[in-house]
């Protein structure tokens, strides 16, 4: 059976339990929101195929358990991941503080050139906010990572987050193929236009 996609990207959602990783995954993969999700036990994944620059990209998105006792299960899934979303809950200060621990986990277990993005989730709950946008942005700048505030409930910036991460992976792949071509390795490879990587920040805006 012929492949129905040009690229397969493996993405990971990591972060503390209860920050809304599963809700983000379901909003993006099925455009659905459910407040009754129980904490993910172990690992689950969803697939959605998107189009970027005329190429079909199959996104295999893994939802990892945030509880400490599942950390050993999760570490095996870092291998092969091309993009990782670090998710915290803007109404939960501790989940934000733990992002640094999750980044340390990535540095220990993931590929050195994995694309990363920090997401401050539940930005629809502004009245219960404990972490300001500015603090989220500053943390992202400190680590050289892109940042978005999202809401799975209101669908704010969910599409933008996944598309931005996929585009950054695509840009990196194109750059690698260009480098490979220019060094004479392998046969001809068709390259789509590569965009220079920029660190940009998006704000949560509710209409």
UniProtKB/Swiss-Prot annotation:
Its cofactor is Mg(2+). SMART domains: ARF, RAB, RAN, RAS, RHO. Phosphorylation of Thr-72 in the switch II region by LRRK2 prevents the association of RAB regulatory proteins, including CHM and RAB GDP dissociation inhibitors GDI1 and GDI2. The modification Phosphoserine is found at residues 180, 183. A motif (Switch 1) lies at residues 31-45. It is found in: Cell membrane; Cytoplasmic vesicle, Phagosome membrane; Endosome membrane. A motif (Switch 2) lies at residues 63-80. GO terms for cellular component: cell tip; endosome; endosome membrane; perinuclear region of cytoplasm; peroxisomal membrane; phagocytic vesicle; phagocytic vesicle membrane; plasma membrane. Its main location: membrane. Mg(2+) binds at residues 22, 40, 63. InterPro entries: P-loop_NTPase (IPR027417), Small_GTP-bd (IPR005225), Small_GTPase (IPR001806), Small_GTPase_Rab (IPR050305). Belongs to the small GTPase superfamily. Rab family. This is Ras-related protein Rab-8B. It comes from Rattus norvegicus (Rat).
């Amino acid at each position: 059976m012929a492949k129905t996609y040009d690229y397969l990207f493996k993405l990971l959602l990591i972060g503390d339990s209860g920050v809304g990783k599963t809700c983000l995954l379901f909003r993006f993969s099925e455009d659905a929101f459910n407040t009754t999700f129980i904490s993910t036990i172990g690992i689950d994944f969803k697939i959605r195929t998107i189009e970027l620059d005329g190429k079909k990209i199959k996104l295999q998105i893994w939802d990892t358990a945030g509880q400490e006792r599942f950390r050993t299960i999760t570490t095996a899934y870092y291998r092969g991941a091309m993009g990782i979303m670090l998710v915290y809950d803007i109404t939960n200060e501790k989940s934000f503080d733990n992002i640094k621990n999750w980044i340390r986990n990535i540095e220990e277990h993931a590929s050195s050139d994995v694309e990363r993005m920090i997401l401050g989730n539940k930005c629809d709950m502004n009245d219960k906010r404990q972490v300001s946008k500015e603090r989220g942005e500053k943390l992202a700048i400190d680590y050289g990572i892109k940042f978005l505030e999202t809401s799975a409930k209101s669908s704010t910036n969910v599409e933008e987050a996944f598309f931005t991460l996929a585009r950054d992976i695509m840009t990196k792949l194109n750059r690698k193929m260009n480098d490979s071509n220019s060094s004479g390795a392998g046969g001809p490879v068709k390259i789509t236009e590569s965009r220079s990587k920029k660190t940009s920040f998006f704000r949560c805006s509710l209409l």
